[in-house]
Amino acid sequence: MKTPAWSRLAGYAWGVLLWNVLVALFGAYVRATGSGAGCGAHWPTCNGEVIPRAPQVETLIEFTHRATSGLAFLSVLALFLWALRAFPKGHPARFGAGLALFFMVTESLVGASLVLFGWTADNVSRERAVVQMVHLANTYFLLAALALTAWWASGGGPLRLRGQGAVGLALFLGLLALLFLGMSGAVTALGDLLFPVGSTLEALERSLTPGEHFLVRLRVLHPLIAVSVGLYVVFAGYLVAHLRPSPLTRRLAQGLAYLYGAQLLAGLINVALKAPVWMQILHLLLAYAIWLLFVFLATSALERGAKRVELGEGGEAVHRGTGGATWRDYLALTKPRVISLLLFTALFGALIAAKGWPGLGVFLAVALGGYMMAGAANAINMVVDRDIDARMKRTAKRPTVTQRVSSRDALLFAFALAVLGFAVLWWGANLLAATLALMGLIWYVLVYTLYLKRRTWHNIVIGGAAGAFPPLVGWAAVTGELSLFAWYLFALIFFWTPVHFWALALMIQDDYRAVGVPMLPVVLGERATVIQIALYALLTALISLMPLLLGELGLLYLAASLLLNALLLLKSLALYRRPERRTAVSLYKYSMLYLALLFAAMAVDRAV
């Protein structure tokens, strides 16, 4: 039972958390203004004095930071002692307060080492960069410990870490990713201080110049890391809210999405304005807020008694799996036949970008990493849609429906594939290619599967954009950038997708109607569907000719595209005239051949 004393302690704990956030932000102000050496190489005294007399501005800034940090230390110590007195043995708030005190001690020691070893002001050593990252990581841990203490003191329940399956893994990876992002941000901010630039273009040029200082070269990576981590954090947030449904987890997931969007915008403004001090502070404040929000999401999802969709009313595991799963069952989770065309466009995107052979290493990275990322998305889709898959003839034998693979194991398999796929693409190609593959995965799972598929007939048009990411991945893997031609490949698949999938929807519309999925034929009927297919086929044909106007492709592609488009339009017209299964099947099968041959024609044309 919550007592008045506990309520007062909870209020104090929240206040201590807020104070430590402010102290950490002021520490960033000390670094950004170059005031870290304001007290010389003395610690805990300031220039050999307990209280400096007639201090310079830098000295006053540094001394103020030390004084406020000292108050923060005392506030955490008081929180620990109060928690010991107020809560019984075994209460999680006591553990949280003890953890906070530990990280406060290490925070002080790391801060002292920066001063005593001279890793302040204009020092550009690798040691300073490493300690700066450790300092940031320790601050994150301190704030997390204080947040947990406040949560538990406010009545939050203890955590259950065992048996959480993919949810636990997703949250752990999210915390790890945010920690890595914060550390990269700390190094980037240090580079902005020590190696200022006159413009964004100059920053990019210097970042790509061989022989530049490592702090300069690391600057270009932080934005890509930020986008990658942001995509994952938003994805993990909504997935956790789906698997651990509650009003709080849903609000936290939505808050993460909005807050991270604001953070990316702040990052762009920070770069455009050449990292002014006030913008650096705001950027860091948003980073702390995102970190704490994710900590609270993890806490609410892992709390004992939290609702788990993989558990029945009595707490028994459902979709546990019948056992005996083979490698074929796990391969089936990835939907190899569906992936084949995605992988084809990714690999030929690389061939088109390279105007020939891109190299074995890049080709294998795109093939293996691309398959893993797409396979991960498909495995998650099977878990989410297992309820409707069981009632559709086409999908009734999927391993998540027959329960040869449990939902828990399928999700763990999916996350393992996603992590490995991202790593393969980053290591074998570059971070941009890995980020684009992650964007495709998240678009398919969040936008299409979790949001659009069961809500609107526009699901294919908007959600189908996920299938347009593979050629971007292949292109970026070769060039490290996205040109206008790369976006043309994206647009081509985007407009081709409704032609392909609405033809499929016509073939199995009875299944979709039975399970309540609002595909276009179910909502508006066959006539509206075939009209839409014809319109998108015409748009696809027109877009396929655009590279010729830009001078990117020649006569070989012109001949191939004219023939392929003529057949696409003829089959679409045949479906319009006779909207029956036979003509729908014909268009569906040809649309796959159309896209494959069109990409092959581009690759050959650019190579000769």
UniProtKB/Swiss-Prot annotation:
InterPro entries: COX15/CtaA_fam (IPR003780), Protohaem_IX_farnesylTrfase (IPR006369), UbiA_prenyltransferase (IPR000537), UbiA_sf (IPR044878). It is a multi-pass membrane protein. It comes from the Bacteria. Signal peptide: none annotated. It is an enzyme of class 2 (transferase). Its main location: membrane. Pathway: Porphyrin-containing compound metabolism; heme O biosynthesis; heme O from protoheme: step 1/1. Residues 1-338 are annotated as: COX15/CtaA. Keywords: Cell inner membrane, Cell membrane, Heme biosynthesis, Membrane, Transferase, Transmembrane, Transmembrane helix. One of its GO terms (molecular function) is protoheme IX farnesyltransferase activity. GO terms for cellular component: plasma membrane. It is found in: Cell inner membrane. Residues 339-608 are annotated as: Protoheme IX prenyltransferase. The chain crosses the membrane at residues 10-30, 67-87, 99-119, 139-159, 167-187, 220-240, 252-272, 277-297, 338-357, 362-384, 411-431, 432-452, 460-480, 488-508, 530-550, 555-575, 584-604. GO terms for biological process: heme A biosynthetic process; heme O biosynthetic process. The keyword Transmembrane helix applies. It catalyses: heme b + (2E,6E)-farnesyl diphosphate + H2O = Fe(II)-heme o + diphosphate. HAMAP family: CyoE_CtaB. NCBIfam families: cyoE_ctaB, PRK04375.1-2. Converts heme B (protoheme IX) to heme O by substitution of the vinyl group on carbon 2 of heme B porphyrin ring with a hydroxyethyl farnesyl side group. Carbon 2 of the heme B porphyrin ring is defined according to the Fischer nomenclature. PANTHER family: 4-HYDROXYBENZOATE SOLANESYLTRANSFERASE, PROTOHEME IX FARNESYLTRANSFERASE, MITOCHONDRIAL. In the N-terminal section; belongs to the COX15/CtaA family. This is Protoheme IX farnesyltransferase. It comes from Thermus thermophilus (strain ATCC 27634 / DSM 579 / HB8).
